[in-house]
């Protein structure tokens, strides 16, 4: 388990992190989500022990990271955003070098190499020169050096930056496979990255943790508070006639059709009026084919929370679980 307690970081007079606290449980895959310059990379460097905090504490399994830094750092694997790979070396020679740096004994290096190369899908590429690899396989090599010593915690900073769509899918699948047995923390400004890969998201903006929950939990928190096109309805028959009927229901703010023949309904804050809509339509001899809460995108959630942070009455404690 990782526990971060009131971390503050100054660079000179610039306040980069503003008293951030959170807990990450063993086996979770958690995403740090935020715009460029939000403080994600700084937070990761502090967790790894690479960068000291100005104040606050980081605990790994209830031990403070600086109490026994060498022992605790052995439990962490780290791939920085711009990892320096030795491009003139082969993949296997580079991983041997990484294994020795991380203190793996001579008798265990062969097994560690075989296991890591298999997990990261590098078997066919182990004898290739790193400089000749595609961006996707360079990223796999970077992840391989981070897990060569079988760490309990894996920290990946922008692991899919610069990848093409096929490479994105492959690396995301690899990251998901690494969870469960180990804790995985990744940072990204790509919203789909968190939605596709992570179980939980921490939204960081301008050095502050402003929201923390599962993706669905964040969407639910947003839905509780705002007006929105949050009901999607499909009916048999004349959609325009059904639209008139829907607008008569108490609690409906606005209702319009979309390009796919569905009716999109905005309703009052915190008011689930789906049953009322169905009842009113049935009374008008309309057949309801489907009615459901319209899915929020993570992009909507991110924009909502970062915009809400600017308001004077913003209370981030309401959105941190």
Where are these regions (language model features)?
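ABC transporter nucleotide-binding domains
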Residues: 2-4, 9-211
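Non-catalytic surface loops within mature trypsin-like serine protease
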Residues: 26, 124, 235-237, 267-269, ...
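Short beta->alpha junction loops/turns
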Residues: 65, 236-238, 270, 294-295
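Residue-level "edge-of-site" marker
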Residues: 112, 130, 259-260, 294
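ABC transporter nucleotide-binding domain
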Residues: 172-268
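C-terminal coupling/interaction segments
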Residues: 269-321
């Amino acid at each position: 388990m990782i526990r971060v307690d009131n971390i503050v970081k100054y660079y000179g007079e610039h306040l980069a992190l503003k008293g951030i606290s959170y807990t990450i449980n063993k086996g979770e895959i958690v995403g740090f989500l935020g715009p460029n310059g939000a403080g994600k990379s700084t937070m990761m460097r502090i967790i790894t022990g690479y960068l000291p905090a100005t104040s606050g504490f980081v605990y790994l399994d209830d031990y403070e990271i600086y109490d026994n830094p060498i022992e605790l750092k052995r439990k962490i694997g780290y791939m920085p955003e711009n990892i320096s790979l030795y491009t003139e070396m082969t993949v296997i020679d580079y991983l041997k070098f990484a294994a020795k740096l991380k203190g793996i004994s001579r008798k265990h290096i062969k097994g560690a190499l075989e296991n890591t190369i298999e997990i990261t899908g590098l078997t066919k590429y182990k004898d290739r020169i790193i400089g000749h690899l595609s961006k996707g396989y360079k990223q796999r090599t970077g992840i391989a050096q981070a897990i060569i010593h079988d760490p309990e915690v894996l920290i990946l900073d922008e692991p899919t930056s610069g990848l093409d769509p096929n490479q994105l899918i492959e690396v995301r699948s690899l990251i998901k496979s690494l969870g469960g047995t180990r804790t995985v923390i990744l940072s990204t400004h790509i919203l789909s990255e968190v939605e596709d890969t992570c179980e939980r998201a921490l939204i960081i903006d301008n050095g502050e943790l402003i929201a923390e929950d599962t993706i669905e939990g964040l969407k639910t928190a947003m839905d509780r508070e705002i007006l929105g096109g949050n009901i999607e309805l499909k009916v048999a028959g004349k959609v325009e006639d059904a639209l008139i009927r829907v607008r008569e229901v108490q609690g409906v703010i606005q209702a319009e059709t979309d390009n796919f023949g569905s009716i999109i309904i905005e309703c009052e804050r915190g008011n689930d009026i789906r049953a009322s809509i169905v009842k009113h339509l049935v009374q008008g001899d309309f057949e309801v084919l489907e009615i459901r809460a319209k899915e929020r995108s993570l992009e909507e959630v991110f924009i909502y929370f970062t915009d809400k942070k600017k308001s004077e009455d913003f209370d981030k404690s309401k959105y941190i679980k």
